[in-house]
């Protein structure tokens, strides 16, 4: 179960997604927590069959469910509702502005289960609340780094403080690429395995350059130089040059960097005077695009080299 949760009160307080929910009964339960973004229509649970009931999910009652409760005898309906309310239901939401039966209101109030109503049709509301819950319940983290859109590739630049991450990003922006976030990158995991990065609202569109201070990229270079959010496709880590360290010179070994259990291509770039890091990052992004099309430059070169070694002439050998 996702450790992130929302209170029912958060649904009532929504103004961004247009849920338009009103509390009818069960106000004592507005602190109930929602852990799942999945929605359930109780259906058979209203007939007494609760084998596949998921009480942790939001229970949506549409025209079909309300009509069924109104058509069967009140005594029979009350038995089924009491059984349903014996479970730790997060909340009931009635769609289409329908007026639920009085016994449902009374039982929800007695059990402390919030009973809400929305004017939306069931299909519309389920779409809205699913989007709301998915956004709010996504696993998140924050990373010290810079996120740039390079040729459509989301490049997360990492490295120790002062190594030149922001300067690289600024040079990339000057070359026509787009800044997403500088210094702190907020990352959300979207199912099944996509990571979306964005800037903290307070520092969005801004960048800190040592010796220059904080600059506003949007104002300096225009709206085409920034993005609100971007899927992270690869990680480039800037590291200090170590003369005794053996660095990958062929690119045959594909390393990965894990964020929220999602593995991303990971490249380490040694930093030393004279190296054009911006060009290297651009080429890394282009190479990533090629790999996505099934072309691996290093492997093709390696295979050609092996083939030439196998067919080369043996020379003048003495028998």
From Swiss-Prot:
Its EC number is 2.7.11.-, 2.7.4.-. Pfam families: Hpr_kinase_C (PF07475), Hpr_kinase_N (PF02603). Mg(2+) binds at residues 166, 208. Keywords: ATP-binding, Kinase, Magnesium, Metal-binding, Multifunctional enzyme, Nucleotide-binding, Serine/threonine-protein kinase, Transferase. GO terms for cellular component: cytosol. The keyword Metal-binding applies. Transmembrane segments: none annotated. The active site is at residues 144, 165, 183, 249. Residues 270-275 are annotated as: Important for the catalytic mechanism of dephosphorylation. Its cofactor is Mg(2+). ATP binds at residues 159-166. Residues 207-216 are annotated as: Important for the catalytic mechanism of both phosphorylation and dephosphorylation. GO terms for molecular function: ATP binding; magnesium ion binding; phosphorelay sensor kinase activity; protein serine/threonine kinase activity; protein serine/threonine/tyrosine kinase activity. One of its GO terms (biological process) is regulation of carbohydrate metabolic process. Belongs to the HPrK/P family. The Walker A ATP-binding motif also binds Pi and PPi. Both phosphorylation and phosphorolysis are carried out by the same active site and suggest a common mechanism for both reactions. Homohexamer. This is HPr kinase/phosphorylase. It comes from Geobacter sulfurreducens (strain ATCC 51573 / DSM 12127 / PCA).
């Amino acid at each position: 179960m996702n450790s992130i949760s929302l209170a029912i009160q958060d649904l009532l307080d929504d103004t961004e997604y247009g849920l338009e929910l009103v509390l009818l009964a069960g106000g004592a339960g507005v602190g109930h927590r929602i852990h799942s973004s999945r929605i359930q229509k109780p259906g058979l649970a209203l007939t007494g069959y609760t084998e596949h009931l998921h009480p942790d999910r939001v229970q949506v009652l549409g025209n079909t469910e309300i009509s069924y409760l109104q058509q069967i005898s009140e005594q029979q309906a009350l038995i089924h509702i009491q059984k349903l309310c014996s479970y730790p239901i997060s909340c009931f939401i009635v769609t289409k502005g329908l007026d639920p039966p009085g016994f449902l209101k009374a039982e929800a109030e007695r059990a402390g289960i919030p009973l809400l109503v929305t004017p939306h049709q069931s299909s519309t509301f389920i779409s809205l609340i699913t989007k709301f819950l998915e956004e709010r319940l996504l696993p998140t983290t924050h990373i010290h780094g810079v996120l740039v859109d390079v040729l459509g590739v989301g490049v997360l630049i990492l490295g120790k403080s002062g190594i030149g991450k922001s300067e690289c990003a600024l040079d990339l922006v000057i070359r026509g690429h787009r800044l997403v976030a500088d210094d702190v990158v907020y990352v959300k995991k979207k199912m099944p395995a996509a990571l979306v990065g964005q800037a903290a609202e307070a520092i969005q569109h801004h960048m800190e350059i040592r010796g220059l201070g904080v600059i506003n990229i949007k104002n300096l270079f225009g709206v085409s130089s920034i993005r609100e959010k971007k899927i992270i496709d690869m990680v480039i880590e800037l590291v200090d040059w170590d003369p005794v360290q053996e660095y990958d010179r062929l690119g045959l070994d594909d390393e990965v960097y894990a964020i929220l259990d999602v593995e991303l291509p990971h490249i380490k770039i040694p930093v030393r005077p004279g190296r054009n890091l911006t060009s290297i990052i651009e080429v890394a992004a282009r190479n990533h695009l090629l790999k996505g099309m099934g072309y691996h430059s290093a492997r093709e070169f390696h295979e050609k080299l092996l083939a030439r070694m196998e067919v080369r002439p043996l020379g003048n050998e003495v028998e």
